[in-house]
Amino acid sequence: ENLLAGPSENDPNLFVALYDFVASGDNTLSITKGEKLRVLGYNHNGEWCEAQTKNGQGWVPSNYITPVNSLEKHSWYHGPVSRNAAEYLLSSGINGSFLVRESESSPGQRSISLRYEGRVYHYRINTASDGKLYVSPESRFNTLAELVHHHSTVADGLITTLHYPAPKRNKPTVYGVSPNYDKWEMERTDITMKHKLGGGQYGEVYEGVWKKYSLTVAVKTLKEDTMEVEEFLKEAAVMKEIKHPNLVQLLGVCTREPPFYIITEFMTYGNLLDYLRECNRQEVNAVVLLYMATQISSAMEYLEKKNFIHRDLAARNCLVGENHLVKVADFGLSRLMTGDTYTAHAGTKFPIKWTAPESLAYNKFSIKSDVWAFGVLLWEIATYGMSPYPGIDLSQVYELLEKDYRMERPEGCPEKVYELMRACWQWNPSDRPAFAEIH
């Protein structure tokens, strides 16, 4: 019996692959972008589904597939994407390259973003009272696919025809390495340690390989006695709770006996600070910088919703992957907030130039102190990784801030971005914007 045959476009269990996926044991199944598959069921947390293709049966990541009649199957449909992320995705410079996106702030509201002669134009897709869709009122369509097809043959109100769908962004993160894998605790022998990537406050970070899955990973180790074991385990516990495309994903821990390990996904290009300092500025231009900042604010909005504070947000604690993907890392100081503020215990070391005044003065932390740090991080991005408060001694920073001194607008930084920095640097925490507003 051919389960994939027949006119079953409306079959709710028929899906199509959005990306290639290569099986890595544990009954996983390789799929190719565009291939049809039938979903038979999901694992305990819904992150993997059992599927059947013409090549066999096995497990695939749920976020790599989409129902066969959904919009996601179209190469031009990018789902919820912000305006400046759309401009980044269309930065290749080809006339007629385009994408269709859903508004992040108003779900259901869609737009076409279209590049022509060095500019990106945005057109709202309207819905008429009879449910038909249009950009220009004279041409109305039953479906989005029909509308896109029409405007690919005639401009009809657009600056040019829709010609080249913009490539989709990176493949999504596979949460968890296999469908059966719910044990965070790993054997140290599962990991081959390679070279050292850097040192953190509490220990070293290494590149390693998870042998079973031939997967490159980052391994954070705990220096003996530098940090309470309890604190290290708290960091791992925080990371287990967190799943967002712009937050570094925890894969496992080794906590039975020292040396302790936290194992996370590996990010190819290392920390954002070094990346900004060494990058080619022609390639990492204003559009890319804004796209990076948007990804960080998206991650922070998620932490805000979850009542987490990061407490050490800075370019050195963000990591860079392929295609300018940025993820916030280093939850070493982060805390789940039960009240609105958290008081750090005496003797905690703070990175002074990123720390909000109320945290420096009273050890008080809240999501609004993360907003202050985000303002400093924006300044780091705008200056390609300069050290904040250039020429100012650490001991003078608080006093100057108290007297209303704030860093000046970096050269080439758009006025609107600088206004956002200044809003993040309001003395009174309640006057600072929330990440939900920033993003």
Swiss-Prot record:
Keywords: ATP-binding, Kinase, Nucleotide-binding, Oncogene, SH2 domain, SH3 domain, Transferase, Tyrosine-protein kinase. Gene3D superfamilies: Phosphorylase Kinase, domain 1, SH2 domain, SH3 Domains, Transferase(Phosphotransferase) domain 1. Residues 10-70 form the SH3 domain. Residues 76-166 form the SH2 domain. This is Tyrosine-protein kinase transforming protein Abl. This protein is synthesized as a Gag-Abl-Pol polyprotein. Belongs to the protein kinase superfamily. Tyr protein kinase family. ABL subfamily. SMART domains: SH2, SH3, TyrKc. GO terms for molecular function: ATP binding; non-membrane spanning protein tyrosine kinase activity. ATP binds at residues 197-205, 220, 265-271. The active site is at D312 (proton acceptor). It comes from the Viruses. It comes from Feline sarcoma virus (strain Hardy-Zuckerman 2). Pfam families: PK_Tyr_Ser-Thr (PF07714), SH2 (PF00017), SH3_1 (PF00018). Its EC number is 2.7.10.2. It catalyses: L-tyrosyl-[protein] + ATP = O-phospho-L-tyrosyl-[protein] + ADP + H(+). The keyword Amino-acid biosynthesis does not apply. A motif (Kinase activation loop) lies at residues 330-354. Residues 191-439 form the Protein kinase domain. The gene is ABL. It is an enzyme of class 2 (transferase). SUPFAM superfamilies: Protein kinase-like (PK-like), SH2 domain, SH3-domain.
